[in-house]
């Protein structure tokens, strides 16, 4: 493609969403295959960005389907564990944007413990219909939600052993984990395991 065929990093004639918090990279088929519910989430900018006083962050992404990434941010009440406000940043296709926004709406008002029971199917239902070859995006959002849960407890001082006992602990044999090349919860678990092994070695 020639430089003169580009405008602001997107091909001329093809509308792309490009903001500080949302970066659309795929627009081959426009909105074909998306339900009205999913497109409404894409158009909803009220949940983009980082809320004030965030104390839990989760991230998941992969380059297996192009550069796909989602970051979720939450302000969690430390006493009640209720997620009072959440926001997101997304990089990828419209389905990824819709999945991220759906995750934020689904999280708000729930406790961290309730949110830890997230599944890709739950978020897919909340998101609405997307093209079949984009259905995996709900899995990235589910991983990012688990990352929010894990990050909250790590910031509260949870150890590797504490995290393993929780329902949102990493399951590296799960399909979600296999799909995600980058996962903030997995990274945190690795760091905690290293710290645990070092402590055990010193005490031996």
Language-model region placement:
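Active-site- and interface-proximal helix/loop "cap" or "latch" segments in soluble metabolic
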Residues: 62-66, 75-139
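C-terminal binding/interaction regions
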Residues: 2-48, 58-59, 77, 113, ...
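Broad hydrophobic/π-residue packing in well-ordered secondary structure
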Residues: 33-35, 42, 66-68, 87-88
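Flexible, solvent-exposed loop/hinge segments and secondary-structure transition points
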Residues: 38, 53-55, 86-89
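Active-site cofactor/cluster-binding pocket
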Residues: 54-55, 61-69
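Gly/Pro-rich active-site capping loops and adjacent beta-alpha segments
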Residues: 72
């Amino acid at each position: 493609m020639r430089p003169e065929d580009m405008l602001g990093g997107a091909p001329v004639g093809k509308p792309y969403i490009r903001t500080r918090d949302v970066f659309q990279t795929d627009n081959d088929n426009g909105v074909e295959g998306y339900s009205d519910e999913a497109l409404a989430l894409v158009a909803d900018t009220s949940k983009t960005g980082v809320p004030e006083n965030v104390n839990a962050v989760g991230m998941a992404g992969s380059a297996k389907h192009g550069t796909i990434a989602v970051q979720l941010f939450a302000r969690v009440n430390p006493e009640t564990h209720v997620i009072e406000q959440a926001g997101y940043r997304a990089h990828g296709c419209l389905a990824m944007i819709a999945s991220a926004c759906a995750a934020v709406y689904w999280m708000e008002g729930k406790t961290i413990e309730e949110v830890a029971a997230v599944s890709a199917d739950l978020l897919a239902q909340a998101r609405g219909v997307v093209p079949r070859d984009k259905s995996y995006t709900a899995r990235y959002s589910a991983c990012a939600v688990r990352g929010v849960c894990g990050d909250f407890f790590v910031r509260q001082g949870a150890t590797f052993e504490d995290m393993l006992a929780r329902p949102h602990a990493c399951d590296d044999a799960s399909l979600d984990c296999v799909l995600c090349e980058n996962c903030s919860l997995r990274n945190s678990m690795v760091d905690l395991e290293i710290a645990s092994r070092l402590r055990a070695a010193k005490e031996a």
